[in-house]
């Protein structure tokens, strides 16, 4: 007799730092709120929800009642809220101190808002690098989700019975332990098949697949994807809500409860053990690997403008860490204690600005806007420049000149700072000013972008040939 199947679902909802308010409003009205409306009507359907810090900030200001509804679902055990870096950074790309700070900020907000001590993490853009287990375990994270394609390299050593292969897809069931430097976390492989089918295929097709993966022992399969697919993407609101796809899907899960269950990831791990150990290379979901040429970091080669933003972020993070360290060395005289209180506030504000400037969306481009959207780049620069200004103020820095490799090209540049602006000058380029930040309005006057060839241009050329 075949055993049971557990469907693990994680829904990720996010809007970038600097996005237009009307986009938040539309996403809430078309996707976030109606999804919750349907979920509340199906209390036996359990899943995980992730709201990025950027979105939580907006919801706190504009839709507090919505957060209360989420908290009620968490309280009754139907929903698990997942942590992440607060402002949705690509975790492998930011310094360790910032990884810890961003995750700690998110976990603190989840405790305050939802009374939940999150142990699971939504990994931004599912960008994985092998050193992450150390950072995640140190931050109090037990498990995260990566795409099944990242496990393909380990296929020969994975349990054959938990691999599902056909002409279109390869799925991996269960969860797996991995470690780095003695720290371990659990990885759930997310199904590309389910990501492509839900919510676009009829409910019956997904149910047929779930029946097909039944084994002699209980198994679990993971679905993880963006909440915006459930209403905000073109034509999905009509299909998912007006035509009733989501309600039909949840009803089908309840109807088939004799052999099919839904759990949160936390619930699942209370009763199940890992299905083995695995060690994954750097990776992400398949489409991201296509856009980036196999490594997310290639975006910084393809787009020098993205690299300029990235290197500026790293430079400010290092500077802020130096200011923190210097502050810790201040002796405890009365005058210095007063100065220390002021500096602590400045450093705290600078840290928040830095974290907001680490929001990933403006650092890369796939098929959506990303780096090409000037308002997203402008928002990143706004926060990074604010962080630099506050760090300079905390350091008591009036004017300075520094010689450093500011753009990671192996050659030195000159960084000039005054109370009103910062200039980056590249001698190797004939003294070109490559960065010109005004602290008052918090803008980079050289924030421009060259259009480049993208693979999807071939489709346009073919269409109009």
Q: Predicted segments — roles?
A:
Residues 98-125, 180, 211-223:
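CE4/NodB-like, metal-dependent polysaccharide N-deacetylase domain
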Residues 5-96, 101-105, 119-123, 142-148, ...:
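Short, well-structured secondary-structure segments
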Residues 86, 90, 149-155, 187-201, ...:
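Positively charged, amphipathic and often flexible ligand-engagement surfaces
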Residues 104-162, 229-249:
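Catalytic domains of cell-wall/extracellular-matrix polysaccharide-remodeling enzymes
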Residues 31-38, 69, 102-110, 128, ...:
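Alpha-helical packing segments of well-folded alpha/beta enzyme cores
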């Amino acid at each position: 007799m075949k055993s049971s199947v557990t469907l693990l679902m994680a829904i990720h909802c996010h809007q970038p730092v600097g996005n237009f308010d009307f986009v938040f409003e539309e996403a809430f009205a078309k996707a976030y709120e109606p999804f919750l409306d349907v979920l509340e009507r199906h209390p036996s359907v359990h899943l995980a929800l992730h709201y990025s810090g950027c979105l939580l900030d907006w919801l706190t200001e504009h839709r507090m009642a919505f957060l209360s509804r989420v908290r009620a679902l968490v309280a009754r055990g139907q929903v698990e809220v997942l942590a992440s870096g607060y402002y949705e950074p690509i975790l492998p790309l930011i310094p360790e101190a910032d990884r810890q700070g961003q995750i700690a900020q998110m976990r603190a907000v989840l405790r305050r808002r939802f009374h939940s001590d999150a142990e699971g993490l939504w990994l931004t853009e599912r960008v994985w690098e092998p050193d992450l287990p150390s950072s995640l375990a140190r931050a109090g994270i037990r498990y995260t989700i990566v795409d099944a394609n990242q496990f393909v390299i380990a296929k020969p050593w994975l349990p054959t019975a938990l691999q599902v292969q056909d002409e279109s897809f390869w799925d991996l069931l269960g969860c797996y332990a991995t470690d780095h430097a003695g720290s371990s976390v659990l990885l759930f492989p997310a199904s590309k098949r389910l990501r492509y089918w839900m919510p676009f295929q009829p409910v019956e097709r997904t149910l047929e697949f779930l029946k097909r993966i039944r084994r002699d022992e209980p198994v679990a399969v993971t679905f993880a994807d963006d909440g915006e697919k459930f209403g905000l993407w073109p034509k999905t609101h009509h299909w998912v809500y007006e035509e009733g796809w989501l309600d039909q899907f949840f009803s089908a899960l309840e109807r088939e409860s004799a052999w099919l269950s839904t759990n949160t990831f936390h619930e699942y791990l209370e009763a199940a053990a890992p299905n083995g150990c695995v060690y994954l290379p750097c990776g992400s979901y398949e489409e991201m690997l296509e856009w980036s040429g196999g490594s997310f970091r290639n975006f910084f080669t393809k787009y020098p403008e993205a690299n300029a933003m990235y290197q500026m972020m790293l430079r400010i993070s290092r500077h802020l860490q130096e200011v923190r360290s210097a502050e810790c060395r201040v002796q405890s005289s009365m005058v210095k204690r007063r100065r220390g209180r002021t500096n602590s506030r400045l450093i705290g504000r600078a840290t928040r600005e830095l974290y907001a400037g680490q929001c990933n969306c403006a650092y890369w481009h796939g098929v959506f806007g990303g780096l090409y959207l000037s308002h997203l780049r402008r928002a990143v620069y706004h926060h990074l420049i604010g962080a630099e200004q506050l760090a300079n103020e905390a350091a008591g820095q009036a004017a300075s000149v520094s010689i450093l490799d500011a753009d990671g090209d192996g050659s030195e540049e000159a960084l000039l700072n005054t109370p009103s602006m910062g200039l980056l000058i590249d001698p190797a380029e004939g003294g070109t000013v490559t960065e010109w930040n005004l602290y008052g309005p918090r803008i980079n006057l050289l924030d421009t972008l060259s259009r480049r060839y993208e693979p999807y241009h071939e489709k346009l050329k073919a269409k109009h040939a």
